Amino acid sequence: MAPAVFATLNEPSYQEQCGAVFMRKFTNQSVTENTNNLPLFNPNPNPNFERSNSSKQCDDSSEFGSYATFNLAGYTSSQLRELKKRFTSELKQIRILRERIESGTFETQQGYTIPEVPAVRSAPLNNFTGEKNDLGPKKKKQKKNVSGLKRSNQFGPSDPESEKLLAGMLNTCSQILVKLMKHKWAWVFNTPVDVVGLGLHDYHQVVKKPMDLGTVKLNLDKGFYVSPIDFATDVRLTFDNAMTYNPKGQDVYFMADKLLDHFDGMFNPAFKKFEAQQLKLTGSSSRPEPDFKPDFKQRQWNQNPPMVANPRKGTEQISIAKKLDSVKPPQPTLPPQLVEPSRVQSPSPPPPPPVIQPELPQPQPPPPQLEIEVEAPPDVSEVSKGRKGKLPKPKAKDPNKRLMTMEEKSKLGMNLQDLPPEKLGQLLQILRKRNGHLAQDGDEIELDIEAVDNETLWELDRFVTNYKKMASKIKRQGFIRNVSTPPRNMASVAEMGSAEKRTRRGDAGEEDVDIGEDIPIEDYPSVEIERDGTAVAAAASSGSSSSGSSSSSGGSSSSSDSGSGGSSSGSDSDADSVQSPFVEAKEAQC
């Protein structure tokens, strides 16, 4: 519409200068239907003016986009002011309509009425106040119909009790959001992401629908959420966007993960309580509500694919795994070593339940490690470590051996250090089969266990395992032999004890004590001492030579001579008699 120009209307020469004629564009209704009622201020009216003017305007009214003519010479100052106000209000309405169309809020839906631009009437100016009163109800109607833009209520037919319950739940959602925004890590998510300021040029390519807690609070305050599900969806979308754009391990990812768990811990109990009250209020037969709860859970879990892929997410997913494990038989969770014997025991599992029931209790008394695996502790890393430690070792003929874990490598390195020196030759042969580049510094070889290939690592593991088995077997056989062999020559031992008692009753001044030389020769090996090219051999049964005489109190006695002759008293020559270690120990005790 072409706006009319109003300037210096109160000047006396204004009407003569401008010709007192203004035009405006015609809209959708005839503006000349009440032209006859306008008062004529021309003292010399033209009798043909009314007929020709009306006929011309009637011709214009048949065309859209024509112009309506206003003869400003026939209006007083007050009427011109009213006309100016009228044009100003129409212009304001057109601008508002244009802004709504450009912003996209102008939609035509069922139950929504597009506000029509009020028709411009050339009625008597004294009726302008009546037209203003007509505009009032239309504006109220417009505001009332705008509510049709909201999403439909998913909680069935509206009634006062249901609306009151829903309002209470939305109030609880508002309280949960306030607590969440006051968290010490929530400052990252309270405002929209500053893509330009942070230089995140690919943010909108990765995140298709940005969301933040501040926007969620604004939408909640304006009443855009008609159900708690929509509110929870936007809150979860905020944290999902952060975990989608930021890789795992960064601070933002960790903060979003913890805040999402914190939100679920507050929202899920409140929503379950709301569902129970809703079902109690309406009844299961009044509306198809049973499909709502699984739909909500499906939306809740399908909306967070990273949480299922990255074991990110923690506590709720592990609890679901617990429920599945408790429902299913515990046989699939056992390691392969335990599953295979059970298959051998039951080659043909019969279908009747009485036969299946005895099979279920068999895996129930497993070692304690199996109980930890079934219980699934909250820390996902601990579960993964426990499962990795229970992996079976590959066989030697297996072409595709699994990679050795870090725990197994460290254990292998400790076992290699405990090998005796006689096994190092075989160890070097195994290493040089596939690793000829090992650097050798004299007798030492530097071995980096991380640089050794997987095949060699498993061969070294088998070598160490076989050695440990052999060593434990030898030790076990020696222990059994010592326990099963009875003590030999019990009589000689008794005689030795009696002889020792008799010698102690004798002269206590003698330093050398004869304890009886009845100990069997086979119990102690011969001792050879090389000195000055001469070898002196003394049997373990020989006693100490003292004062040139060798006597035996218990029977046969023999004194070992040195290579040159008999023993003489008080001689300190190299050919002195050699005492057995057993005799020396007894002398030291005395």
UniProtKB/Swiss-Prot annotation:
UniProt region (Disordered), positions on chain: 125-160, 282-400, 476-590
Listed Acidic residues bias regions: 509-521
Bias-annotated ranges (Pro residues): 347-369
Biased amino acid composition, Low complexity: 537-562
Keywords, alphabetical: Bromodomain, Nucleus, Transcription, Transcription regulation
Biased composition, class Basic and acidic residues, residue ranges: 288-298, 498-508
GO BP terms: DNA-mediated transformation
Location of the protein in the cell: Nucleus
Residue ranges constituting the NET domain according to the UniProt record: 394-475
GO cellular component: nucleus
Swiss-Prot/TrEMBL domain comment: The NET domain could serve as an interface to localize different proteins or complexes to chromatin.
Protein name, as recorded: Transcription factor GTE7
Name of the coding gene: GTE7
